[in-house]
Amino acid sequence: MSEDRQGRSGDSNKILYCSFCGKSQHEVRKLIAGPSVFICDECVELCNDIIREELEEKAQSARSSLPKPREILEVLDQYVIGQLRAKRTLAVAVYNHYKRIESRSKNDEVELAKSNILLVGPTGSGKTLLAETLARLLNVPFTIADATTLTEAGYVGEDVENIIQKLLQKCDYDVEKAQQGIVYIDEIDKISRKSENPSITRDVSGEGVQQALLKLIEGTVASVPPQGGRKHPQQEFLQVDTKNILFICGGAFAGLDKVIQARSNDAGGIGFGAKVKSSERKQEVGKILAEVEPEDLIKFGLIPEFVGRLPVVATLEELDEPALIKILTEPKNAITKQFKKLFEMESVELEFRPDALSAIAKKALKRKTGARGLRTIVESVLLDTMYELPSQENVSKVVVDESVIEHKSEPYLIYQAQPAPAKAASGD
């Protein structure tokens, strides 16, 4: 019956009907034939409306789920101690970046430029942790690349497009997800060119890498081999558009403060009108770095085009002893909290005395490792205890004080009081 009603496309005498709304070919403007089915122009339009509404709802949902700068800062505060200026800069930059992605789908007349980020700060000041926390908060794919391993295409080393392959691996080769991810490129200062003047010889791990990264950071379609594959001519590649990927580059930039000071001194002039620089300013490296200008980065060894692709610059200060003590105890995933949890699994309480925390912070400062060195110090002083503890009985508490850190003495072990053995009843 239904076959008679729909008709066959090859039978010109039969009246054809839409398989969805049931209208005949005479009641609609156009009837499109498929394999044993028909759809009219009205149903096609209705389907388009349904899809459009769903896309708008999805975009609305994405807008509502995008945290505001203040909310981003609040989350960063839970994991990263200090560095308020850098955190505020990052919060605004990341919020604007994902708003820009939304605006591209609306076909606005004004096209918003991409704003990648450069983090400048000493080792262990929190650059990588900031980038990781942002990616976790926004629930986007995230990968870390080491700039020192990168070389120009055709040379021994990692091709810059390997960065995108790593990002794809993080999201199971979902290209759409990867295209809205975050890439953190560490040690970016190590690829500065060796001199201010362009070199005649090839600098495959310096200026050459900067040139190779330019297009990737600005926005290009990168060809990446599929899962488990290696590049060869006969292979089909995955095409990944990098224009919406947020690139965060970080580096210690040792010596940049001297470049900034030299510029400031030149600007001061000489003679009666010269500005007198205080001796205190020489000590405040963090404050000097906060005055960084694009020309300073170019003088340091980044090429002008590369500096232009990183318009947002956030500087981080060197962490002092009070900040390191806070890092040990306050963040959600603080090092002391992690070790306390490990000992708790053995039904043992772990206590760090205030003098121990201060000694750990001083040791990290002496080693110039910043927050990154804190875990190494705690690991080393607790290693023997963590080795012996599972085999020991009746230990209720482990105490770490200054002597454990400074003199490498053993932590104090406090044992549970053993119940006195019951007296045997005397037989009369």
Curated annotation (Swiss-Prot):
Keyword Metal-binding found: yes
InterPro entries in alphabetical order: AAA+_ATPase, ATP-dep_Clp_protease_ClpX, ATPase_AAA_core, Clp_ATPase_C, Clp_protease_ATP-bd_su_ClpX, ClpX_bact, P-loop_NTPase, Znf_CppX_C4
Protein residues bound to ATP: P122, T123, G124, S125, G126, K127, T128, L129
Keywords (A to Z) from UniProt: ATP-binding, Chaperone, Metal-binding, Nucleotide-binding, Zinc
Transmembrane segments: none
SMART domains with a match to the protein in the record: AAA (SM00382), ClpB_D2-small (SM01086), zf-C4_ClpX (SM00994)
BP term (GO), one: cell division
Family membership noted in the UniProt record: Belongs to the ClpX chaperone family.
Function of the protein: ATP-dependent specificity component of the Clp protease. It directs the protease to specific substrates. Can perform chaperone functions in the absence of ClpP.
Protein name: ATP-dependent Clp protease ATP-binding subunit ClpX
